[in-house]
Amino acid sequence: MVHPVQVGKRTRMSFSRLKEVGQMPNLIEVQLDSYDWFLKEGLQEVFDDINPIQDYTGNLNLEFVGYKLDLDSIKYSVEECKERDSTYAAPLKVKVRLLNKETGEIKEQEVFMGDFPLMTEQGTFIINGAERVIVSQLVRSPGVYYDMTVDKTGSKLFSATVIPNRGAWLEYETDSNNIIYVRIDKTRKLPITILARALGYGTDAEIIEFFGEDERLKATIEKDNTKTREEALLEIYKRLRPGEPPTVDSAESLIESLFFDAKRYDLSRVGRYKFNKKLAIHLRITNQIADQDIVNPQTGEILVQKGEKIDKDKAIEIQNCGVNEVYIKIDDKSFKVIGNHFVDIHSLISFDISDLNIKEYVFYPVLKEILDNYADEESIKEEIRKNIYRLIPKHIIREDIYATINYELGLSYDIGYKDDIDHLGNRRLRSVGELLQNQFRIGLSRMERVVKERMTIQDQEVITPQALINIRPVAASIKEFFGSSQLSQFMDQTNPLSELTHKRRLSALGPGGLSRERAGFEVRDVHHSHYGRMCPIETPEGPNIGLINSLATFAKVNEYGFIETPYRRIDPKNKRATNDIVYMTADEEDLYVIARSDEPIDENGYFMDDKVTVRAKEEVLVVPVSEVEYMDISPRQLVSVATAMIPFLENDDASRALMGSNMQRQAVPLLKPQAPIVGTGIEYKAATDSGVLPKAKNAGTVAYVSADEIRVRRDSDGGIDKYKLLKFKRSNQGTCINQRPIVSKGEVVAKETLLADGPSTDLGEIALGKNILMGFITWEGYNYEDAMLISEQLVREDVFTSIHIEEYEAEARDTKLGPEEITRDIPNVGEEALKDIDERGIIRIGAEVRSGDILVGKVTPKGETELTAEERLLRAIFGEKAREVRDTSLRVPHGEAGIIVDVKIFTRENGDELPPGVNKLVRCYIAQKRKISVGDKMAGRHGNKGVISRVLPEEDMPFLPDGRPLQICLNPLGVPSRMNIGQVLEVHLGLAASKLGWHIATPVFDGAIESDIVDCLRKAGYSEDGKTVLYDGRTGEPFDNRVTVGYMYILKLAHLVDDKIHARSTGPYSLVTQQPLGGKAQFGGQRFGEMEVWALEAYGAAHTLQEILTVKSDDVVGRVKTYEAIVKGENIPEPGVPESFKVLIKELQALCLDVKVLNDDNQEIKLKESVDEDVDELEVNIEGAENQLEDKEEKEEEKEENYKEDSDEYDDLREEDVEPDLEELSLDDLDLDDFGDEH
């Protein structure tokens, strides 16, 4: 039944039937928690890994004792960092201790280790003034993976891979002769028995005794030509280090360092957890029949007798009492199962050890040694602390390798199972914290090398920690990560939703991940383990489809980096749904059967039906109630935030829903945001978590409200909290960020109450578009191919008007000929052009500018030329005054116009940090009001997108019987073939709701159904089919059929025609071919390509063809003469030879072919090498505006030179964030707009 729900300050009528259990987590906690972990634990782990650094003699010992981020000495606030192009960071100070073992002297110092970028409260970083997001990466989890292939004879071949976090890989494979091979670190393969011998089982008898009788093992031993441990070691050494003289000692130490050295081989916590989970003996002996008595080694009691079946609890008990080898019976054969000897420490120690914080399994032999030698609690705890790295080794151990080999042998007896690498139990997230930690570790290990070198060079008596440590490698690796890693992206700030989604994005690309080319179909596909963890709908269309995903609404990331989703526990005794919520990873979930969230249950939680629909792995089954163990907590838990904002998602086709999710993220913030009439109820949560809205830090009373500041008097101590609002700031994408207060003076606010609206929010709900009265009706062909017909009212009343702010900067540099100067005194510029320029040479705020207007007047010294006699005379009379300068002012680029809203000036005198060689920097911000116009792209939320084809006067639009004209006409043919019926239901419900004055929440998969909509239409007094008679605005006649009319929520997308339209007559030309450049950014021309030439040839349009290929393109002399002729009104001269023809001739000559050009009389035509003289004589420059491109190149060269000169200062330079020009970009570099959809 429809019922009211309070969201923020608005009441929505909700159609949901289910009571949601449990709260949605904070939507950006992926970022916040991960960074928090890094500061608290991640950094410490890296220091622990690297401690202590010893010199080669073992005398000096350098240790990192502790660290702190000095949050008090942060240079600038977040806002100031954005203004000053600096990085929001805090200094990292590390306490370092140096011990000289000879003298016993200890020196301690606090060492500054560079500025460490801090995360803002919104989950972003400010790097060089630009807001960036670190995207989480989906990678394969370290662990051991088994796979099976079937060869052509039909026999099963098993293989395995042991993947560490870092270190050498081990791969096992079986060939069709049943011989098992191993590859160490991707080298050639060896029989696996060689590895077993080298690790300690030297003879054939020992191998067979340890691993048990097995056909494949015997076949492998026959193939193996080594017979002792020494031979095996030498054989492995020859393979791994070919060309070096093999000795047993060096081979032993090689294997030690490859696998058993924590500095070279790291499984990481996740790897150890996955290893123990996969190789635990209890999983493989459960439900098998014991072939010998199994005895508890501590007490001697028989746990399982020969011939008895081992149940699950017994199997766990067997493992935890330290039994590592069990014989089981399979088809009259005895098979020996070997585990990796890890046990649950809590089952072996009777007293409380929770303060040791051990969650993982521990290595039994080490634990047994401790328990045998110590008796009292304290000393046992102390020993466990001391031996923690032996109990939970970070590297692989021999027992692990034996267990992996045994697992491989067992697979052919159907013991164990093969792994699915696309399962989310085998893929994990590396979030900000871990990515940073890895980067920091790289920097520290580079530093370690430097420290060791310095230890040997410098005098050991007077040496200090400060003198040993060089922080540059650490600072550089962090800087490089934030500045240029594929996962550090320029934040998509088009609107709050795009910001939120960017922070929740999961990418399988990036360093250590997949590449677009290698990723096959399986990796990209939807997998059953994605349910509730990753959205099956929101992903880009294009080369990245399925590689970039979005986190589902309720998902969390656990300490190991696996994505978890919440379920309600079903009480096993009386089978009622409890309110206990359990977060489960994908591999835990596979063990249970899980009911749907909309399964009918009564108010006490009992199921109403005897049979229940459940999910079990990838199956959907119907089972009796008694078998159900868990239940989903919400119908929207399987989709992402953007997808959950599509009402009636359940009635849309998936591919259109995908477009709908992606296009909401491209909606431009409008002048007056308006929340949707038909929403889904998640709008409020999305806006509050996105970080664009100011919230009250403490409870209190509003004491003062103005447009740019809100003050709240705290209840606790009567103090005042001040909140500055952002007014008309530019976002990363050039849209406008503007906050408006929504509280009034005297209002009582609780903690976390929203105080103001931001861009695209309305009363704290995300409001990306407008509710528009529309009808599905064709109109004179203006609806053809998804085009839209709109009413002039939308233009006049600024319904779809948005503000866009562009930033332009000019810098005055030192050049070789003297400094550039910012001034009002510009050569050859009239007073008219300077009317809005102040005395400093900078445009005034509030001035209206058009393309070509001067923003910042700037002159650059010209090179000294040979002076004529007259000039020398003038020089002599007037001194330096006549020195030549040229105008290099910053002008408004082509096709831009607007109003100056802000000007910022940075100079050295004011103490601003500027790049080397720059004396003054001026930034101008130009704002434009863009009304909706023909060619703009608009879309609904259901993937129904289109371009505006015509703006019709209001009086010509079709109108309703009550006289209201429609605002937009959409083509009814856009609905059936696309199967996004959600838009029709939205229109019907919108019609009824607007009449009833309701705002509606219809949550995905749990919203209004057809009967609810019919009830609403009836209540509002409309006919039940939602159709009405429409009248033609031009004639007043009714249309033939009744038409579906109602309110649809429509967005204006960031693909605006003003940014795309472009025209050129003359302009810059390419250097070699002399053809016009391409693209709007280069002020280029339209390419007349091969196929277009064919078209003209087909029509026989010879003269048109000739002029297009010569004077309109690359006939250098001809085009200048033609331009002159047009200007003077003369006849157009004959075309000359195109430059690209000359280039072709030169290329052939470069291939040593003697190519000549002959005329009709077989006379050779001399092609002039250079046409510059001819052009100079003509004295016409058609290269475009004031040689701007030349200046750009000069500037770039200068910058390069400056960088080279200041290579030491390079670290302090800001790296410029240049927004890429999309038309010129190769696909490989495309990060930010990967989700963009250009059709």
UniProtKB/Swiss-Prot annotation:
Entry keywords, A to Z: DNA-directed RNA polymerase, Nucleotidyltransferase, Transcription, Transferase
GO MF term (any one): DNA-directed RNA polymerase activity
Reactions that this protein is recorded to catalyse: RNA(n) + a ribonucleoside 5'-triphosphate = RNA(n+1) + diphosphate
The EC designation for this entry is 2.7.7.6
Q: Which cellular components does GO assign to this protein?
A: DNA-directed RNA polymerase complex
Family membership: Belongs to the RNA polymerase beta chain family.
Chain's role: DNA-dependent RNA polymerase catalyzes the transcription of DNA into RNA using the four ribonucleoside triphosphates as substrates.
- Protein name, per record: DNA-directed RNA polymerase subunit beta
Oligomeric and partner information:
The RNAP catalytic core consists of 2 alpha, 1 beta, 1 beta' and 1 omega subunit. When a sigma factor is associated with the core the holoenzyme is formed, which can initiate transcription.
Name of the top EC class for this enzyme? transferase
Q: Supply the InterPro entries for this chain.
A: DNA-dir_RNA_pol_bsu_ext_1_sf, DNA-dir_RNA_pol_bsu_external_1, DNA-dir_RNA_pol_su2, DNA-dir_RNAP_su2_dom, DNA-dir_RNAP_su2_hyb_sf, RNA_pol_bsu_bac, RNA_pol_bsu_CS, RNA_pol_bsu_protrusion
Q: Which GO terms describe its biological process?
A: DNA-templated transcription
Q: Which organism is it from?
A: Clostridium botulinum (strain Loch Maree / Type A3)
Span list, region Disordered: 1182-1239
Reading the lineage from the top rank, the first entry is Bacteria
Q: Where is the composition biased (Acidic residues)?
A: 1191-1200, 1206-1239
Transcription as a keyword of this entry, yes or no, is: yes
